[in-house]
Amino acid sequence: MSKGIAKILSGLLVFGMVAGLVPAAPGGIVHAKAAEISEQDVTAAENSEHKHCVCGTGKLSVEGHKHDEEQIWIGISNFSDIKGDGNYYLKQDVKLEEKWKCEYRVNLCLNGHSITRTNENPDSHPAQNAVIYIDTNAMFTLTDCKENGIIKHEAENTGAGVYNSEGYFIMYNGMISKSSCGVINAGDFNMYGGTISGNTNKNTYRYGGGVYVDTKHIFKMYGGTISQNTAARGGGVYVHKQGEFQMYDGLISGNKADYGGGVYNSNTFYMSGGNITNNTSKTSGGGVYNEAGTFDMSGGTITGNTSNQYGGGVFKASGNFTMSGGEISNNTAATQGGGVSNLNDTFTMSDGTTISGNKAMYGGGVYNTGRFDILGGMITGNQSDKAGGGVFLSSGNTITLKNTAIIIENTVGDNINNNLYLGSNITVQTESLTDKACIGVTTKETPKENSPVTITSDAASAEYFRADNSAYEIGTDAVAGVVLKCKEKLPIVPDPVPNRFTYDETEHAGIELGENYTVASGTNSA
């Protein structure tokens, strides 16, 4: 019904009331026909203001964000209704035969509706097959006041959900799904909420199932969920060379890849919060695969991830991994490094860090073939099948222990103590160990009598070390270096020969007589 007709009917209704043609119920309340009420309600709904904060729900709690529930949004039925900057909300589901190109500063509320790309070329570049394309210097903000709207492809896995081409993308709410990659970011992308889930990247030349961070661009994650995505590398997030990923909070969970189930980093990854959990890799890096560059972890947790070969929690092929906070726990690798597998370069952990509850065949907590500096922190409660329940150091590599390094209560096999396992020709460097430091030691070389195995290459206090095997003990050598040696054997004391004597021509033995005694008769000897 048009607004003009509605006004005419409203006028007739008022006239009927005044003329007494429409009877009033007791109390003076007029009951109009249901059809008229319905039309009036629809008209009122069409004219009602759509107001809410840009975060969609008013629940966002992040530094720098101030809620404004009075923001007014303009309803649209198609993207052709967007003529410039502004706040817009969907009044219905929208289907696109080609990508929508954002050229303005647009805040879009899905309002519980869907945006579906229906027509695409599987052989085209992901930018061409995107649902939404953010142009250079444009800004697109995605939110959803009803929290169940979605951006997707009708035919799964054929293009990006959102392609950011040197623009600005902010995600507060809503879902991006059923794409080859949820978000390809060649600009700046801040994620505060919402979900990127169920995307599968089958293209061999493109990595990243959830988010792909391109060269010289940044993805900052303050909240939200990246889950159930799949790719060859970086099931959750792939960071390309010279790209950068900063994770402050949020969840990366249930993603799968050949390498880097949760995150694959080729340049820079800073993690100060959030949780990377329950991701899986077919080969290396169930939680995180660090190909090169820098992985700096100052907080958050990497837990419950699985690798079919190396690095259940973290696999570092090269580059530097610095762990100054956070926890790596309950991860599993089929062969090496349940918590961390450090292949090359340096892995450093310090006070306030924990590696615990991880499992692998070798190196339940850490498997190291590079350089490992333990400046503090705790490696405990890890388990291996073969060797290195806490830490496995292969032959010819370096480990440094400083400050409050703790490697205790790790086991191998059937609950046998096995904490720091030193391969052949490996010595430990120590510096300024404190009273809280405690390191259990097992060596590949077996100590022999008068031939101990050297543990430290420099002078160190033996009180910070203990032997995992009770058959050995910790000692020091001529230059005060710590060694693992056989326990000193106690001197063998022969059983005493009992005194014998003859009494009444009968021989007696084992009778204690003391130093001074007298035999009354017969033959005797003292």
PLM segments and residue spans:
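Solvent-exposed beta-strand/loop surfaces, strongest in extracytoplasmic domains of secreted
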Residues: C486-A526
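Extracellular/surface-exposed low-complexity segments
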Residues: V30-I82, K402-P491, G514-S521
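Well-ordered beta-strand segments characteristic of repetitive beta-sheet solenoids
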Residues: Y88-L90, V106-L110, I132, F140-D144, ...
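C-terminal segment of classical bacterial N-terminal signal peptides
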Residues: V18-H31
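Beta-strand-rich solenoid/repeat architectures in extracellular/passenger domains
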Residues: G112-Q128, T143-G159, Y172-S180, G194-Y207, ...
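Sec-dependent N-terminal signal peptides
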Residues: K3-V18
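Extracellular beta-strand-rich solenoid/capping regions of secreted or surface-exposed proteins
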Residues: K95-N107, R117-D144, H153-F169, S180-G187, ...
